[in-house]
C-alpha cells in the first residue's frame, strides 16, 4: 500500500511538472507577443534620448529607426563616421521632428580611456534607452585554431561582444539610477543558449551577455530600471549573411518593432514570436540530441562557406 501511494504521488508530481513546463512554454510565446500590450516606453525610459551601438547596419540600424519612429532622439554609435552620417540623414529624412547625433567609436579598442571619452560624449544627453547591440561573429563556423582571421579575430569578437554592454551600462546607469527610470537592452544571440561547437568564442561571449544582463536585473530591480536580454535567432542582416526573409527569418525592421514591443513585458526573450517558438521547441529536445543537430548544421554551414571561398579563389 505504501509503495502504491508513493507511485501515485510521484505520478501527480510528474504531471504537475509537465503542466508547469507547458504553461511556461505557452507563456513565453503568447505572453509578450500576443496577450500583453506594449508598455509606454517613453514613460519607462524617463528621458528622451536613446543610444544605439552598431547603429549603421542590421538590427542596430533597425532599432535606431524604430526608436525614432516612437519619438525618441537617437544617438548613433558605430565605427565609421561616413556610415553614421548616412544613417543620420536617412533617419531625419523620415522622422524630421527628432534630433540625431553621432559618435564614431572603434569597439575593437578595449582601452578604458577610450571608453571614458565615449561616455563623456554620451552623458551630455539624458539617456532613457540604451541598446547595446554592437557585435561581431565568425566569418564562418570552424574549430578554434582554424577560425578565419586567427587570434586577432578571436580577440576582436571577445572584446566587441563583451566590453560594450559591460562598460556602457556601467557608465550610463548612474544617470538612470538618479532618475529612477531607464531601459537597457543587451542584444545577445540564441547561440548563447547552447554550447555551440564550431562557434566557441561567439557562443561563449553571447552567454556572457545573457548572464551579465540577468545579474544586472537583480542589482537594479528596485531602481526603476528595466534591463532586458534579447537573444534572436536568424534575422536577415549583413552579419548573418542571410538575404531572404521568411516565416522564421524577419528583416531588421520587423524584428526591431517586435523586440521593442516586448520591453517591460518579459526580461529574457528572442524578440520575435517565431524565434521564441523555435527556442521553446528546441529546449524540449534532450541536450545530447540538440547538440548533435546544431553541430551538424554548423558543419554544413562551414562546408558551404569553404566551397564558396574556393570558387572565389579560382575566379580571381
UniProtKB/Swiss-Prot annotation:
Active site feature: 202
EC number(s) reported in the record: 1.1.1.330, 1.1.1.-
Binding site for NADP(+): 47-76, 106, 206
EC category: oxidoreductase
GO biological process, alphabetically ordered: androgen metabolic process; developmental process; establishment or maintenance of epithelial cell apical/basal polarity; estrogen metabolic process; fatty acid elongation; hormone metabolic process; long-chain fatty acid biosynthetic process; molting cycle, collagen and cuticulin-based cuticle
Signal peptide (residue range): none
Domain of life: Eukaryota
Tissue-specificity statement: Expressed in the gut of larva and adult.
Family: Belongs to the short-chain dehydrogenases/reductases (SDR) family. 17-beta-HSD 3 subfamily.
Name under which the protein is recorded: Very-long-chain 3-oxooacyl-coA reductase let-767
Native source organism of the sequence: Caenorhabditis elegans
Record lineage: Eukaryota, Metazoa, Ecdysozoa, Nematoda, Chromadorea
